[in-house]
Design a protein with these regions (language model features):
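Alpha-helical transmembrane segments and their immediate juxtamembrane flanks
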Residues: 177-185
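Soluble catalytic domains of membrane acyltransferases
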Residues: 14-173, 182
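N-terminal membrane-anchoring alpha-helices
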Residues: 1-17, 182-183
């Protein structure tokens, strides 16, 4: 099923930038912060990127996407329903447990926690990485070029204002991608 999923996403024109996990084993077991979050398709493409890298994703998405028709497929793809309306859902602890129970899993989070523009990222991705003792990898998607990937930068866990550091690095990465697109034109 996963190979079929990768094939379908690639047939739709997507190209993946995937790190060599032999050289970067830390990318096999990490928190992936993906931005910008623009559509539900982010999860579909993101799952294919991690499948292609040989990693099992656990992608946290709002529970409203799970219904009678989609639930089985989404769970098989590694999507995990999250009740965002319940502040006492122990989401950080559950994600940490997923990481501690499996050395070949990446927790994938969109730190904006919404598709709307935000000034600051939420801190959950940092708390999960810190408590699980895993690094944070940056993920990206460029819908204009149909280019997606993860892992070009690993952040050391620095407690002071880490969400702003991640946000700045993702913005820099997007600017580089947009500059490359302009130069190709």
């Amino acid at each position: 099923m996963r190979k079929i999923w990768i094939l379908l996403v690639k047939l739709s024109g997507w190209h993946f930038e995937i790190p060599d996990l032999k050289d970067r084993p830390e990318l096999r077991h990490c928190v992936v912060a993906v931005a910008p979050h623009t559509a539900f398709a982010d999860y579909i493409v993101g799952a294919a990127v991690l499948f292609a890298a040989g990693v099992r994703p656990k992608i946290l998405v709002k529970k409203e996407f799970f219904n009678f028709f989609t639930r089985r497929l989404l769970l098989h793809l590694g999507l995990v329903p999250v009740d965002r309306g319940n502040r006492h859902n122990d989401l950080v602890e559950k994600a940490v447990e997923m990481l501690k129970n499996d050395d070949n899993v990446c927790i994938v989070i969109t730190p904006e926690a919404t598709r709307k523009p935000v000034k600051r990222f939420k801190r959950g991705f940092y708390e999960i990485a810190t408590k699980a003792g895993v690094p944070i990898a940056l993920g990206f998607m460029d819908f204009k070029r149909k280019h997606a990937g993860y892992g070009p930068t690993i952040l050391e866990l620095v407690p002071l204002h880490v969400e702003q550091q991640v946000q700045k690095q993702i913005v820099r990465q997007i600017v580089v991608l947009e500059t490359a697109t302009i130069q190709e034109s």
